[in-house]
């Protein structure tokens, strides 16, 4: 078991029982399927769609490309988004999956709502915007895709400000907080469509807002190197989330591979959770992880292609390579602001060389972007960053450098594209 003896936001007084690939496991209320599998040392969750390579949990949120599962009649669900309930029965998705021929028995409804301010995103920036807007008595709606408001703060070691702020919002009668609510459409005159997940069926919110605040945060980017898809490789921020939010140690011996400063607190949290941090490999120091070696262990979950070691080399010159044994590789290549809704609303973007990402440039009328979505990545701790996208390997062989883990797209595929 990789469950930490204390910590996390899970309810340890409320144990749950679930099945994955016909094997029973134990978990707690507040777990996702992904966190519960990691807690039970299940590392291989599925196989890749084209090559059938073993894949494990890579992230902790909606951006998960690997851990795709079937639950009941629903397929292509991300284990990081599946909230665990007692008796849940899930199967890892191997290949492309198949839609169920059974009719959907869920009952869905729709709600029309109006407000002065709609805040999309319930992280620190979104909660701050909602607090400011609600002070004047405006009707405020906050929508967030997660089961809890808090965003990245849920994966941090401190949450005092979050609890105090949420209590203040809940005490204000004109504030409505929507969880499990994904904004997926931003149309003319600030009409926003929101899909809310509920037991027994979904709900479609059609919200007309005088002003929309986009506080959708940013997604962490990976770094691309040979065999960067082994189970045991995950985003650095995800490792921190599993420790602090779910009380799970995602490994025992960790290596961190980065090009920015956001991994400093990750290393601290890994050590505090009892993991050994074997090394921090920073491309700004002239080193990189150039390849990975699978574990010699066999068997689904415990081994079967899981990470066993990393190969480290100098970026310039031909110095000696070295191998480090590890079962967890935390990667961070910087952050991309989440600007899909901003672009759909006809907002204009520009590329920021210093941040190595696109950020908002010209916003539509009555639309504001705040926090990490606006390029304010100080809260992510990114600090200085050395843009670095692909680590070359000997002979420039690109067929195992995965760009799109979900669809098995490699650097070789991109180079062949017209």
Model-derived segments and their meaning:
Residues 1-418:
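Residues forming the flavin
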